[in-house]
Amino acid sequence: KIGIFFSTSTGNTTEVADFIGKTLGAKADAPIDVDDVTDPQALKDYDLLFLGAPTWNTGADTERSGTSWDEFLYDKLPEVDMKDLPVAIFGLGDAEGYPDNFCDAIEEIHDCFAKQGAKPVGFSNPDDYDYEESKSVRDGKFLGLPLDMVNDQIPMEKRVAGWVEAVVSETGV
């Protein structure tokens, strides 16, 4: 069973989460806004998690996102042992408007879930993007899938479909 969890500011992250759900079909439960998660332990019931977040860390607060992920990552997730649960993270950003912190949300989610024992999967090649800096790049890879719904010349559906296929192949789920 595959779970898809996200937060959104403008609806773009919802659109991507819905597309991931459509791509996975019956393998996945319907996407859930992280705001609606009442029992964080329920995430352990899944064989694979897709986690999505909108742009954040735009200079106001470099530690917290200002989205519903904040409460979940820092108040709920620390109670959960995610031992070896594969998590694939997608983040939405604006490489032209915020080129110095492109999709930084991926890094925050990655680190919080990894700290709880989850196994992050689905890393991406940063050479496929035009940006200045991102905390979400480590060892030459994005820690998930960055998406720029405004400036990217590659359609979201094409990027996401290929990434979902790669994640499913990588995890065997």
From Swiss-Prot:
Q: Which terms does the record give in the GO molecular function aspect?
A: electron transfer activity; FMN binding
Coiled-coil portions: none
Keyword set for this entry?
A: Electron transport, Flavoprotein, FMN, Transport
Ranges where the Flavodoxin-like domain occurs: 2-168
- UniProt cross-references to Gene3D superfamilies, sorted A to Z: 3.40.50.360
Name the needed cofactors: FMN
Show the stretches that span the lipid bilayer.
Answer: none
Q: Which family does it belong to?
A: Belongs to the flavodoxin family.
Q: What does this protein do?
A: Low-potential electron donor to a number of redox enzymes.
Q: What name goes with this protein?
A: Flavodoxin
